[in-house]
Amino acid sequence: FKIIELYGFSASGKSYKAKKIVSKNKLNDSFLNISTKNRFFRFFYKIFFIFNIQILDLIFITKIHKFIKFSDLIIKSKSIFSYLYVIGFIRYHIKKNQSIIMDHGLFQCLYGSFLRSPNNMILDIHVAFLFNDYLKNLLKNSVFIIIKVKTNLTIVKKRLFKDKNYQKLKFFNKNRIK
């Protein structure tokens, strides 16, 4: 059983690279196809996977969110929902013994939390230890591969501007990413 997660900045080409990997390997690509569905369908699709969550998962999500400060409740709620969906999706496919590829997994959830927190701060190094301990439990008897998607940041900026994703453009400019 194999889980492949692609990690990188928004508009960096994660989905594109994931589709190339799917065509070469026998992987479940349902995670990649959800973005093509309408918002109503996506919501209920994600709820289906959340039912696979276990108590250990809820404890992990709670602990992670104690260390991350969000500017408002809506952003925090979206972050929690994202973690629930991703973990539920992984648990479901572990039960089915299906190898999967994800262009927005646990590390992307953490990265998103970082981007949405005031001053881009995650308050404690314990987050790394929490992730490490949790992944050992969640992914035992599995192969977990993380692929960092490298990209041309000029192209990413153009895509973000075209998509009117000003929050992430602001992050680029604030941190002088060139």
Segments and roles (model prediction):
Residues 6:
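Hydrophobic anchor at the beta1->P-loop junction of P-loop NTPases
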Residues 27-42:
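Short beta-strand-centered segment that lines the nucleotide-binding/catalytic pocket of NTP-utilizing
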Residues 9:
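P-loop (Walker A) phosphate-binding loop of NTP-binding proteins
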Residues 15:
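Walker A/P-loop
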